[in-house]
Amino acid sequence: MKKLSTVIIILILEIVFHNMNYVNAQPDPKLDELNKVSDYKNNKGTMGNVMNLYTSPPVEGRGVINSRQFLSHDLIFPIEYKSYNEVKTELENTELANNYKDKKVDIFGVPYFYTCIIPKSEPDINQNFGGCCMYGGLTFNSSENERDKLITVQVTIDNRQSLGFTITTNKNMVTIQELDYKARHWLTKEKKLYEFDGSAFESGYIKFTEKNNTSFWFDLFPKKELVPFVPYKFLNIYGDNKVVDSKSIKMEVFLNTH
């Protein structure tokens, strides 16, 4: 009887863990659920705004510690980017910010706004702002982050696997933001994912699958209502600072031409 009870408990636990994996797997979108480039253009949207985000150099920093905070859910770092000398990253909540506060981190992110940080010496919010702002993009600095890791991105166009390309990262644990940026950067440069006046494609999404089969995806194109384009509304997907294992993450891109 005791053995039977043990078997039943094991079976229940297996079902629970199976269901946990199932719940954590975001279902793939249907074609009609994806944002359409033609809808965005018809609403007077300019895809060049998105193109600029993923072709401009990202913010990068290695082994840095935040110098201060403005709000409890952000961290400000002494990183030079273009003509600025500070970068503020916003995180989903205070707990997440505290995770990285006063610790040595690596940063990789896409800026969404400039002249957005109040100078430390100016408590008056009417004074001139500086710096640039981004979401997430933090990983703990590690001496193991030395060698490049290769990640293959499989691309399916109109339901046919068409090509694959490789991106690299020197991090064992890497943010989704870094991987997403590098994939979109390559697709924009090589396959015209984003052009000033549109795209070579009508819709699409990028999908990430972790070792435990947890999966999630991002729509590659803005909603038709995002006119005029507001960068923070497009990039706030990175605010959760999602970090994955670069050795096991699977990346796929699904594109449609009509």
UniProtKB/Swiss-Prot annotation:
GO terms for molecular function: toxin activity. It is found in: Secreted. PROSITE patterns: STAPH_STREP_TOXIN_2. Keywords: Disulfide bond, Enterotoxin, Secreted, Signal, Superantigen, Toxin, Virulence. Residues 1-25 form the signal peptide. One of its GO terms (cellular component) is extracellular region. Disulfide bonds join 116-133. The keyword Isomerase does not apply. Its main location: secreted. It holds the Pfam family Stap_Strp_toxin. Belongs to the staphylococcal/streptococcal toxin family. Staphylococcal enterotoxins cause the intoxication staphylococcal food poisoning syndrome. The illness is characterized by high fever, hypotension, diarrhea, shock, and in some cases death. This is Enterotoxin type G. It comes from Staphylococcus aureus.
